[in-house]
Regions:
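ABC-type nucleotide-binding domain
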Residues: 3-174
Length: 174
């Protein structure tokens, strides 16, 4: 029976992982990665080389063909999918903002967050400086697609949203 991942420390290890979407056509072969708590770790490579697939495997959207993925010294398969996914904060390349204020967009994952917590998350994401220059600061209403914000500003807002949840492990997909 799967157990809850509580108080994650942030250690992630891929041990000789193989994966294929189509049988007999390996996409990833013998992948070995070790990331310790507090470590910054970057996967770099051309589009289509498997970076996002590794994230999907880590979050158990797909099962691996061989090897093991360990989180805090235990197989990721030992944890419930829901508790495993709660341990991670993720910002994708494609941003998602909704119609509402800047503060509401940042607080999306933590609706009970205080204004001070929202501002602190924005500062940690390096978004505070541009937010306070907006006509109404954190109370500026933005459209569903992010309005006139640059792609970089949209990503900073999404990073602030994740920072507010204070995940044990932060994943940034390009």
């Amino acid at each position: 029976d799967a157990v809850e991942l509580t108080a994650p420390q942030g250690e992630v290890t891929f041990e000789h992982v193989d994966f294929s979407y189509v049988p007999d056509r390996k996409l990833l072969q013998d992948i070995c990665i070790e990331a310790k708590p507090g470590m910054r770790f970057a996967l770099v490579g051309p589009t289509g080389c498997g970076k996002t697939t590794l994230i999907n495997l880590l979050l158990r959207f797909y099962d691996i063909d061989a090897g093991r993925i360990m989180v805090d010294g235990r197989s990721s398969r030992d944890y419930t999918r829901a508790s495993l996914r709660r341990a991670f904060g993720m910002v994708l390349q494609d941003t998602w903002l909704f119609e509402g204020t800047v503060a509401e967009n940042i607080a999306y994952g933590c609706p009970d967050a205080t204004r001070e917590q929202v501002i602190e998350a924005a500062k940690r994401a390096h978004a505070h400086k541009f937010i306070v220059q907006l006509p109404s600061g954190y109370d500026t209403v933005i459209g569903e697609d992010g309005g006139t914000f640059s792609q970089g500003q949209k990503q900073l807002l999404c990073i602030a949203r994740v920072m507010l949840t204070d995940p044990a492990i932060l994943l940034l997909d390009e």
